[in-house]
Structures are given as C-alpha cells and as structure tokens.
Amino acid sequence: MIENRPWLTIFSHTMLILGIAVILFPLYVAFVAATLDKQEVYAAPMTLIPGTHLLENIHNIWVNGVGTNSAPFWRMLLNSFVMAFSITLGKITVSMLSAFAIVWFRFPLRNLFFWMIFITLMLPVEVRIFPTVEVIANLKMLDSYAGLTLPLMASATATFLFRQFFMTLPDELVEAARIDGASPMRFFCDIVFPLSKTNLAALFVITFIYGWNQYLWPLLIITDVDLGTTVAGIKGMIATGEGTTEWNSVMAAMLLTLIPPVVIVLVMQRAFVRGLVDSEK
C-alpha cells in the first residue's frame, strides 16, 4: 500500500520545479541577449525582457560569420552536421561489425582483441589526442572532412554495448540461420540488425550529440575557415585582451547551434528511451 503524503508530494514537485528553473534560466538569459542590440546587451543590469533584434542578429552571423576572418555561419552548421552525421554512421557501423565478429566468429585471441578495445576506455582523451593528431598529419589529412571524422569513428563504448546485446541473443537463431544456409552477413542483415534497432536509436542520439559538440578535435585539425565548426566558431567570437565581445551575436549563434541536436532528440525521443530501457534488460 502506498501512503498518501501531501508534504512529500509538495516537496518533490518543488524540487523538480527548482531544478527545471536552474536549467532553463541560463537558456532564457541567452535567448534574451540574442534579441538585444550591442548597447542593450551591455546595459547594467541587462534587461530580462526580450528585445526586437533577434532576426537581425541571426541574419548578421548567418551571412557574415562569427568574426572578421570567418565563414558564414550556415557553412559552419553544415560542417558540424557533416561531421556529426559521419561520426555517428561510422561509429555505429564499425562498432556493430566489430561486436558481431567478436561474438559470433570463432578465431584465436578474439577475447584478447576485445579487451584491447575495451581498455582504451581507461585512457583519457588527452593521452590519445596528440598521437592521433600526429598520425593525421602524417597521412596528409589535416584540413579535411576525413581528418575531422575518421579518427572519431572507433568507439570502445559502442562496441562493448553491442557485444553485450549480441550475447543475449539465443543460439537457436544461429542454428536456424545455418540450417537455412545463410551466410554470416545474411544472418547479420536479416536477423541481428533488425533486432538491434532500439539500441541503434539510443546510440544514434548519443553519438550525434557527441560529434556535434566536438570542440578540441576541430581546433587541432582545422585551420581552413571554410571547414570550421559551430562550437569552435562560437569560442572564437569571445574576444580576448582589449577586444569587445558582441554577446548578442554570440548568443544568437548559440541558439542556432542548439537547434539540430534538440531536433534529433525530440524526433527520436521515444526510440531513444526505448533503446536505453531495452539495453538494460
């Protein structure tokens, strides 16, 4: 029997509302700043009432970019989308095939290979990133989409999650496929892949956001302004030294940068939650 405790209900709802307010208030301030002009945004204290310059600020960065030596912001959004989508597609493909080989194929040292992949989770990004940059430079892949995406396609986490899921599939599926004369790739495409759709949805959302939010990697790989990404571009808008930061333009760029991942999460919300729940069963 569940006791009805009004004070507990009031307390839990109050904490929930406070938590939502703490999360949403900075976003609201950013939205208000994006609607103001340069003079209004520097007023002390800054107003919390939205202004009328949102479209003007968006048009300014959309056409002129985020600085004097910058590509238009639409180009940065396109670069970020290409990078995030390529990383997502590559991670899922490589991880699924790697996990499939480790679980369903019998070859010497397969467990050793898995643990070699898994142990990379223990290495901080800072330990791996500069050797990776050196490899990319030696392969002449600086200032290219290949340099932006290929090194980030391997994922020990996704490989581990797919391996754990594949290990829950009954052996009868393999036996039935063998009796029907299905090849390994036919078994993968017709049976394993359809059963993995919920896991794919969860990993797609997580990996897309991971790729979209990349900051350090594009900063090290890209010097061509036409290949710049949004996150690195926004950081470049913040002036250093005696320069003045146009915070209204910065916040307008931030709002545009938020739109693609928010759309992905909203569109795939149900599949994302289902994938997380099913992966725990």
Swiss-Prot record:
Function text: Part of the ABC transporter complex UgpBAEC involved in sn-glycerol-3-phosphate (G3P) import. Probably responsible for the translocation of the substrate across the membrane.
Gene Ontology biological process terms, A to Z: transmembrane transport
Ranges that cross the membrane: 16-36, 85-105, 113-133, 142-162, 202-222, 247-267
Name of the protein in its database record: sn-glycerol-3-phosphate transport system permease protein UgpE
Organism annotation: Escherichia coli O1:K1 / APEC
Record-linked Pfam families: BPD_transp_1 (PF00528)
All copies of domain ABC transmembrane type-1, residue ranges: 77-268
Key words, A-Z: Cell inner membrane, Cell membrane, Membrane, Transmembrane, Transmembrane helix, Transport
Family stated for the protein in its record: Belongs to the binding-protein-dependent transport system permease family. UgpAE subfamily.
InterPro entries found in the cross-reference section: MetI-like, MetI-like_sf
Assembly, per entry: The complex is composed of two ATP-binding proteins (UgpC), two transmembrane proteins (UgpA and UgpE) and a solute-binding protein (UgpB).
Primary subcellular site in the record, as a coarse category: membrane
Organism domain of life: Bacteria
Subcellular location: Cell inner membrane
Membrane topology annotation: Multi-pass membrane protein
Entry GO CC: plasma membrane
